[in-house]
Amino acid sequence: MARFFRRRKFCRFTAEGVKEIDYKDLATLKDYITETGKIVPSRITGTKAKYQRQLSRAVKRARYLALLPYCDRH
């Protein structure tokens, strides 16, 4: 039987030494949102819990300020 090597997930924010996730950094936020507009869970992305909380807060702020859409285009 073939065994699949699963790539080890790592937190991009820890590796880059990011202190705070900014809601105005749309390029970073779009990497963690699905095409339907949902926030991707940390078990998929490998983001640590501390940064996942900051990420979700930043996405919600950006949505409130209309920088990001709440859902996909219909």
Swiss-Prot record:
InterPro entries: Ribosomal_bS18 (IPR001648), Ribosomal_bS18_CS (IPR018275), Ribosomal_bS18_sf (IPR036870). GO terms for biological process: translation. Transmembrane segments: none annotated. Pfam families: Ribosomal_S18 (PF01084). Keywords: Ribonucleoprotein, Ribosomal protein, RNA-binding, rRNA-binding. One of its GO terms (molecular function) is small ribosomal subunit rRNA binding. GO terms for cellular component: cytosolic small ribosomal subunit. HAMAP family: Ribosomal_bS18. Belongs to the bacterial ribosomal protein bS18 family. Part of the 30S ribosomal subunit. Forms a tight heterodimer with protein bS6. Binds as a heterodimer with protein bS6 to the central domain of the 16S rRNA, where it helps stabilize the platform of the 30S subunit. This is Small ribosomal subunit protein bS18. It comes from Nitrosococcus oceani (strain ATCC 19707 / BCRC 17464 / JCM 30415 / NCIMB 11848 / C-107).
